[in-house]
Amino acid sequence: MRIMFMGTAAAEGYPALFCVCDRCKKARELGGRNFRSRSQALIDGRILIDFNHDALYHSKLCDIDYTYIKSLLITHRHEDHFSPYELNYRNRGAANLDEGVEKLQIYGPSDIKPPLERFIRDDNNYGFDVNTVEPFEPFDVEGYTVTVLKAVHGGGALIPYIYLIEKDGKALLYAHDTGILPDETFDYLK
């Protein structure tokens, strides 16, 4: 299993936009790899994790063509992980795709569905489908077993997830942007 981290920073990026602390000043001075964009990753060139405002930058920086990516896991609906507006650009009128390109299958917590529903159109033959997933219920994504696990982040109104991704005897726990995990998540992982 190969993971490409395209972005590893928090919402403010690094160095932070308006920060003048010594670390951010030094990062600006050094440049290059000291700059970090918002969280996004790609598993084996097939499964994308999170889609934020830096997605266009990531596609250029990492030479990734999102057109043929069929699966997207969303960890939570904060904008540094999830941008429904960017996903709208996959719809007719904004994108001209090759015939036969499959709809993007988006998997995530139930609270990502309402902001995406406004972009789902009946005449859309290559946009996306939204699949809500529940904790501790493994499901298949392109031959990978994906298990949603509960995370702690952002207060009570947010539904944050982390993902356990397994294939061919290998496992990846993708656990970004979370506090101390709930006991039931630790119990599941034992």
Each predicted region: which residue ranges?
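Extended hydrophobic secondary-structure segments that form protein cores and membrane-embedded regions
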Residues: 105-109, 132-133
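Active-site metal-binding motif and surrounding structural segment of the metallo-beta-lactamase
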Residues: 46, 51-105
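A short helix-to-beta-strand connector/capping loop
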Residues: 102-103, 123-129, 142
